[in-house]
């Protein structure tokens, strides 16, 4: 029973970390990376699909992405989707290849992005703490129902707290890494 509560808490905390990683990957730094366009949607024969379904995205260099549509007639639609994705990118078609240069971030924009990243990290910490609270409530219910002793509850709460500390430290590490990426010129 105690192990079930701890396992559930750990799984939920891990999901919070994964969600944070996904959110942080969407925040554009000055460097190009192929995951930057993952959430861009392209109209493909009447339905909206992810860009990686209709084109290959590769790194040209540290500051340029190369996008090549699998079908030549899709090139203009892919370029338009990138331009309309509200990422501040200005793609240019060169034959079949769409080159997407990464513009330099201004100091002000970097600071704004750091604020956004810190906010995302704080939201993840709140989610972790909510999982801890739910786990502790479940443990209290087990004590109330006389399924475990108070000593077992206390030990389990300590273990849940250690899990919480571990995941909060991981969030801090992710935040620090992303801030360093953003502030690197």
Swiss-Prot record:
One of its GO terms (cellular component) is cytosol. Keywords: Cytoplasm, Protein biosynthesis. It comes from the Bacteria. CDD domains: RRF. This is Ribosome-recycling factor. Responsible for the release of ribosomes from messenger RNA at the termination of protein biosynthesis. May increase the efficiency of translation by recycling ribosomes from one round of translation to another. Its main location: cytoplasm. Pfam families: RRF (PF01765). The keyword Protein biosynthesis applies. It is found in: Cytoplasm. InterPro entries: Ribosome_recyc_fac, Ribosome_recyc_fac_dom, RRF_sf. It comes from Methylobacillus flagellatus (strain ATCC 51484 / DSM 6875 / VKM B-1610 / KT). GO terms for molecular function: ribosomal large subunit binding. Belongs to the RRF family. PANTHER family: MITOCHONDRIAL RIBOSOME RECYCLING FACTOR PSEUDO 1, RIBOSOME RECYCLING FACTOR. GO terms for biological process: cytoplasmic translational termination.
């Amino acid at each position: 029973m105690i192990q079930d509560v701890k396992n559930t808490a750990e799984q939920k905390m891990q999901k919070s970390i994964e969600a944070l990683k996904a959110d942080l990957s969407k925040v554009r730094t000055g460097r190009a990376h192929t995951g930057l366009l993952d959430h861009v949607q392209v109209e493909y024969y009447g339905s909206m699909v992810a860009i990686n379904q209709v084109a290959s995205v590769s790194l040209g260099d540290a500051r340029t992405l190369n996008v090549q549509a699998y079908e030549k007639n899709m090139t203009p639609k892919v370029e338009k989707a990138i331009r309309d994705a509200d990422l501040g990118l200005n793609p240019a078609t060169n034959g079949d290849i769409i080159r997407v240069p990464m513009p330099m971030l201004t100091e002000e924009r970097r600071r704004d992005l750091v604020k956004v990243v810190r906010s995302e990290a704080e939201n993840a910490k709140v989610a972790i703490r909510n999982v801890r609270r739910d786990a502790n409530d479940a443990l209290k219910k087990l004590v109330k129902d006389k399924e475990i002793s108070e000593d077992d509850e206390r030990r389990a709460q300590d273990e849940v707290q250690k899990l919480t500390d571990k995941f909060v430290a991981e969030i801090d590490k992710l935040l620090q890494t992303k801030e360093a990426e953003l502030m690197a010129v």
